[in-house]
Structures are given as structure tokens and as C-alpha cells.
Amino acid sequence: MTIYALSSGPGISGVAIVRISGKETSKVLKLLTDKDLPKPRVATLRKINYINTSELIDEGIVLWFPGPESYTGEDMAEFHIHGSKAVIDALHHSISKVENCRLAEAGE
């Protein structure tokens, strides 16, 4: 199972970081950005869209960490997006539409 969560913590902020880890990470990155994977461990500016549409969620920094050389040991990515609740919720909702992806539980 691929899991995702807000890793920068809740609350008001200018930037939020959403981390995703697991087998479907590369698929999610490609679907959300409509592009090939960025170079590993290189911060890349990308437009982030709702899955299967061209409707923009946000424009932010994307980082790709292929496993096993990642923090989790699995394929992992980070989305550095604007910190509004609406943007965070839209990204979470879009990721949830990918099969085998779910919101992480506490401590995962």
C-alpha cells in the first residue's frame, strides 16, 4: 500500500509538505504533474493537477526519491505546495483516487 500525509504539520503556514511513500509513488507523480519523473533528489518546479484533468491544484516544488535510497527505503516523493487548507485537501483528494493509495495513519 502506498501512503501519503501532510508531513509539515497542521496549522497555518505559507508552505506545506505532503510526503508519499510506496510502490505507486512514481505513478502518482506522473499522473499529478502530467510529466516524466523529475531527476532524483533534485527540487523541480511543477504544475500539480487533479488526476486525469488539466485543472490546476497548485504549482510547487516536487522531489523524487527512488528506493531503496530514500528516507523510508521505498520510492518516495514530496510535494512542497502552498499551505492553504484548500490546496492540501485538493492534493490529498486527488492522490486518494489512485488505486492502492491511502492517507497514512498516525505513526506510519
Name every feature range the model reports, one short phrase each.
Residues M1-E108:
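A glycine-rich (often HGG/GG-containing) alpha/beta subdomain
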